[in-house]
Amino acid sequence: MQESQSKKMNEAKTNRGLHFFKIVLRPPYRLWLILLRYLHKSYNRVLLAYNGVLLAYNRALQLILIPKTPIASCVLHGRPEVHSLVCHRHMYNYILAIKSFLRFYNDVTVIVHDDGSLTKKDKRTIKKHVENINIIDRDYADEKIDKIFYHYPNCRRYRDECVNALQLFDYMLLSESDKIVSLDSDILFFKKPETLIDWLRDGTEIIHFWEQEPAGTREFLAKINLDDCFVPVNIGLLCFYKETMNLDLLEQILSKVEIFDWCTGQQIYSILLKKQIERHELSFFEPSQYQDQTEFRDGGDEQIARHYWSSVGTLDEYLPDRKKIIKELLNASKVDKI
């Protein structure tokens, strides 16, 4: 019995020794592969932990600090309208975005389009933070637009399939104002946006966020033989007009599109804006001042607004800027109370 156990122990030692020599004698590239695998796993663990910290920090900002920022206000009806499509997940992002603008200029009517995910509590929270804001419920919008789309089946198909189609149709079809601003919920204003305010007061052109090569736009236009309608537009911030809507043209375009995606609306805006060129000059916000995520620049005093593309994840840039805006809003509130 003892001899058997002793024999097994000797064999185990021999196997460990052989295993050691096998590792030493392996080709160097295999050792590198093992090392890289180990480092990759470690990196992923660190990255997950880092993202977890960022998300926790983001949630803390939402639940603790943003609710403490001072109430903003706007005009209930009759002014140029600032339209935003807002979801439950980005509700606090939107509140901070619109407050960052209204602190500089509030002679506007503000419209929130419910994407269908806003809860009753979300709507109460938004109304609490922005006096006189208008919220268009998804059910109400669907009913109104459905009647308009009676003779436009492809427009209805697109709106039913893609939630952000509301940015294309509802902003214009449900607007009471001739002047419309499309504002995404992941934009922050750092300084008084003079170009935007001048347009709201008496501008006559169309002004858009500059994006040099919007995703898929050239390919989309080529497929429907409208290459000459390319505009380097990002609709995250866009100043335009209710008359831009052309349902007959949209029905014709959408009949040629089999599969819609998140970029379809922006691609179609390129066409609509180009068709307006005889009535309104096409212009764009200075990219160094109004920075789209593809054009972010470090520091400096130039930046007036930033668009973060939060849907694809730019927390590294967004969270520090967000904290800065919150701090400025809170400090302004303290000054007002003195």
Cite the ranges covered by each PLM segment.
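A short, conserved beta-to-alpha structural element at the edge of catalytic cores
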Residues: 207-229, 322
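Catalytic core and acceptor-binding pocket of nucleotide-sugar-dependent glycosyltransferases
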Residues: 212-214, 230-312
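A structural signal for short coil/turn segments at secondary-structure junctions
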Residues: 105, 130, 175, 276-277
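Short, solvent-exposed loop/turn segments at secondary-structure junctions
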Residues: 89-90, 117-118, 141-143, 187-189, ...
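N-terminal anchoring/stem segment of glycosyltransferases
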Residues: 3, 7-147, 308-338
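GT-A fold catalytic core of metal-dependent nucleotide-sugar glycosyltransferases
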Residues: 163, 167-213
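Aromatic-acidic/polar surface patches that form glycan- and anion
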Residues: 83-94, 160-164, 227-231, 258-265
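Active-site-proximal specificity loops/subdomain of glycosyltransferases
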Residues: 128-174
